[in-house]
């Protein structure tokens, strides 16, 4: 009888389990007439964008629950290729990278999942999520039908599918939609490539899996595939009807969705912390929900770009800070902000049930008293001698120095060294320069460093060449024969947006020295100007990771340095560097200290007295620091701390003012410590356009959207001056969101080499509204003058070299009515710079 009862119970349990699984698999999600359909009924997607690599795994569920308490019914996630395949062919979906577990946690908490598997994701993430090792193939064509690129993409997507295909809705999981590529219209026009990505995803997830592609209202038609759902991306304050107008004309019966509604914005080093108003965000979402428009709020919770994962923007080079707070409703450390509560109040209107309460934070916020990092190991202790021993021939090169990628290094630093000849008698094509002339003929070092180069001669600091500032030259002192030129290059995050994502690190090409130097290859003579190219380099890797830092301290214990000098072993010789404040080895290196805790909690370690580099706590890579700001603290999750002793290591490539650190309860995300101005107008500089003849003048139309103007005839020049004379809003300030110049065929000219030569006025007090916003590839950011500064206003663009142009395109702000849009204008073009 007992056996019979046991058998019956087992049978009932099996039937119950089977029924539960069957119930899950009966859910359906589809694209219907003007709406999405969940189980055959109209469904508005209310998604929260969150990124699992930016949240410590122990906090995943808390962040999901915070999104749920806002009234969201889904989470939207990118899949970061370079997190999962950091070395070619070596995949990791465990621990912090267990994206399948993240999806299961979402389902556990009643949330659906939208997956955006790239291969490119942007996200202000290193190389837009593409792995650096792709660049070991120098001629690779990224985000195109390059055979090697597509081969690796398909392998990666298949590996992701092994994790996530079992979790689609039809298989009882939470995944309802999958995105094809990402904002491809801002990169180019290539439907065959986008189609191949679509076909790859369909082969993995099935023909019935709803697929969509996202872009901007201005470019979505470039690559729109007929069999995919089209969604729009735009930010707070945008004119929502305008954003969907063209989509409605082309597909009147399609559901509308804003797949990225930008709640805030990202920060870059050397600029103020970005914020966006809560009212604009809430009103925009309210308007969309009232019209049945689905959305994903990017970001609902931003988190942190731990380690070296923060990317960089382009044109130019604008590296992102470690914090990805994004001014989102849920802040970097998982706390509800005023935006959160305002949004929650509005979202309650669209729920027939009371929204769940916000969950309790998993950790308290704690302070840490000041402590000093007393241990020091010089930078050369981090040299990768093992790699040098195995690949010495590669690292001792004839010709150009090696990039990081050429020596199989993704992140870190490289020390480049070469011997210098003597300034002396040089004869070339009738030009004779004597030692007595050395003060008249200063030497200039010319190089392209990606990204932060410090230059030394025999270990003595000469100066810095910073890619962020667009610097490529440095004056050198008089040189003696046999001295050694050393260039220490730190690579920051690779560019994540636009055509510049093919962002090699290190020295790019061959540095040259212009001046009176002999003994190198003579590459050109122009009157008394002689240019030489070094042809022998030593390239020393300094990888960026915790293990290297630990080895540096182990080496220090075995071979302690003194305060008098440091012996630096080299291949074939030993160099001795004096321990001086300007020396290569003084201050630059690894620092270690400890602090004790009686209670564990989240905290923000303050590094405002430090220089530039990376930080590790208990072996976890926290991220980058840089004294210029605006970020001065790093978020330390309490789950990475322990009661008792905790270790802090700082790799500082510049050197600290003070070796102290402390933990505070709130972050410092908006403290700039800049040496120079943040605007593009020098003190006392006034533009003089008298006598200049405009190539075009007229009036722009009022309202939103791109406008195109053609010149009467093609014009050629390097410098473009945009002069704004009045505003449609009858106020005394002007705004421009984006600006393109057109070539002779009417196509947009590349803006990669553009810089701002002058701007009469820039609003940097209420936000980062500098003039370079007019060519930053972002339609939601803009240049603005300050209130009360009278017309006319002017911006001068330096395109780098002469270009022949047939016209231009202008985009006003995206908000309804295009606030402060320019009315009357004049345009000037010159090959030479304008007068001041």
Model-identified regions with their sequence ranges:
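Aromatic-lined substrate-binding rim segments of carbohydrate-active enzymes
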Residues: 60-126, 198-206
């Amino acid at each position: 009888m007992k056996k019979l009862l046991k058998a019956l119970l087992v049978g009932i349990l099996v039937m119950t389990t089977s029924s539960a699984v069957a119930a899950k698999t009966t859910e359906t999600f589809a694209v219907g007439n003007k709406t999405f359909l969940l189980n055959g009924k109209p469904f508005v997607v209310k998604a929260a964008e969150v990124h699992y690599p930016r949240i410590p795994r122990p906090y995943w569920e808390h962040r999901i629950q915070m999104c749920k308490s806002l009234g969201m019914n889904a989470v939207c996630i990118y899949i970061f290729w370079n997190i999962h395949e950091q070395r070619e062919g070596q995949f990791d979906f465990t621990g912090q990278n267990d994206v399948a577990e993240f999806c299961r946690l979402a389902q556990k908490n009643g949330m659906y999942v939208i997956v955006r598997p790239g291969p490119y994701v942007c996200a202000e993430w290193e190389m837009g999520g593409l792995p650096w090792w792709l660049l070991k193939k120098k001629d690779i064509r990224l985000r195109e039908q390059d055979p090697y690129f597509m081969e690796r993409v398909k392998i990666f997507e298949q590996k992701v599918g092994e994790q996530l295909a079992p979790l689609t809705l039809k298989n009882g999981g939470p995944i309802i939609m999958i995105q094809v590529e990402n904002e491809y219209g801002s990169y180019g026009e290539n439907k065959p490539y986008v189609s191949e990505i679509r076909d790859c995803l369909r082969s993995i997830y099935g023909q019935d899996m709803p697929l969509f592609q996202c872009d901007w209202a201005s470019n979505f038609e470039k690559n729109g595939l007929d069999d995919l759902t089209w969604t729009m991306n735009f930010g707070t304050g945008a004119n929502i009807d305008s954003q969907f107008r063209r989509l409605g004309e082309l597909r009147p019966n399609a559901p509308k969705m804003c797949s990225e509604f930008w709640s805030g914005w990202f920060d870059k080093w050397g600029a103020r912390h970005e914020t966006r108003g809560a009212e604009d965000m809430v009103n925009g979402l309210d308007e969309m929900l009232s019209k049945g428009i689905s959305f994903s709020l990017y970001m609902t919770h931003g988190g942190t770009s731990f380690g070296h994962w923060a990317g960089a923007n382009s044109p130019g080079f604008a590296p992102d800070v470690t914090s990805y707070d994004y001014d989102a409703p849920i802040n970097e450390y998982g706390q509800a902000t005023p935006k959160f509560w305002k949004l929650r109040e509005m979202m309650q209107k669209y729920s027939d049930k009371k929204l769940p309460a916000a969950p309790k934070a998993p950790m308290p916020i704690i302070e840490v008293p000041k402590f000093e990092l007393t241990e020091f190991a010089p930078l050369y202790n981090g040299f990768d001698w093992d790699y040098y021993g195995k690949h010495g021939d590669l690292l001792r090169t004839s010709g150009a120095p090696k990039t990081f990628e050429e020596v199989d290094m993704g992140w870190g630093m490289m020390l480049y060294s070469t011997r210098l000849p003597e300034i002396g008698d040089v004869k070339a094509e009738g030009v004779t320069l004597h030692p007595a002339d050395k003060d008249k003929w200063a030497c200039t070092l010319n190089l392209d460093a990606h990204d932060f180069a410090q230059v030394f001669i025999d270990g003595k600091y000469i100066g810095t060449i910073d890619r962020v500032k667009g610097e490529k030259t440095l004056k050198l002192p008089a040189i003696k024969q046999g001295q050694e030129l050393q260039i220490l290059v730190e690579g920051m995050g690779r560019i994540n947006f636009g055509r510049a994502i093919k962002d090699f690190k290190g020295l790019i090409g061959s540095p040259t020295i212009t001046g009176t130097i002999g003994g190198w290859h003579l590459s050109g003579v122009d009157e008394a100007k002689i240019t030489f190219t070094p042809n022998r380099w030593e390239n020393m890797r300094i990888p960026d990771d915790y293990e290297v830092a630990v080895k540096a301290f182990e080496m220090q214990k075995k071979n302690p340095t003194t305060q008098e000098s440091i012996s630096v072993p080299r291949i074939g010789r030993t160099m001795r560097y004096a321990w001086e404040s300007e020396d290569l080895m003084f201050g630059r290196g690894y620092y270690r200290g400890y602090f004790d805790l009686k209670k564990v909690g989240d905290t923000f370690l303050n590094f405002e007295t430090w220089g530039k580099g990376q930080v590790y706590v208990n072996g976890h890579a926290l991220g980058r620091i840089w004294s210029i700001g605006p970020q001065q603290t790093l978020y330390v999750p309490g789950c990475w701390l322990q009661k008792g002793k905790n270790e802090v290591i700082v790799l500082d490539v510049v050197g600290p003012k003070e070796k102290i650190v402390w933990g505070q309860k709130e972050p410092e995300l908006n403290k700039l410590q800049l040496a120079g101005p943040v605007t593009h107008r020098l003190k006392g500089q006034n533009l003089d356009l008298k006598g200049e003849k405009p190539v075009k003048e007229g009036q722009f139309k009022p309202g939103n959207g791109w406008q195109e103007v053609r010149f009467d005839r093609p014009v050629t020049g390097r410098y473009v001056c945009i002069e704004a004379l009045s505003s449609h809003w009858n106020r005394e300030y002007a705004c421009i969101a984006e600006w393109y110049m057109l070539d002779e065929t009417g196509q947009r000219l590349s803006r990669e080499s553009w810089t701002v030569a002058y701007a009469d006025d820039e609003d940097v007090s209420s936000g980062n509204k500098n003039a370079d916003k007019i060519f930053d590839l972002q339609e939601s950011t803009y240049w603005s003058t300050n209130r009360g500064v009278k017309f006319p206003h002017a911006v001068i663009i330096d395109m780098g070299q002469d270009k022949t142009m047939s016209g231009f395109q202008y985009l006003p702000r995206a908000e309804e009515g295009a606030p402060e849009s320019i009315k009357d204008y004049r345009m000037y073009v010159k090959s030479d710079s304008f007068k001041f």
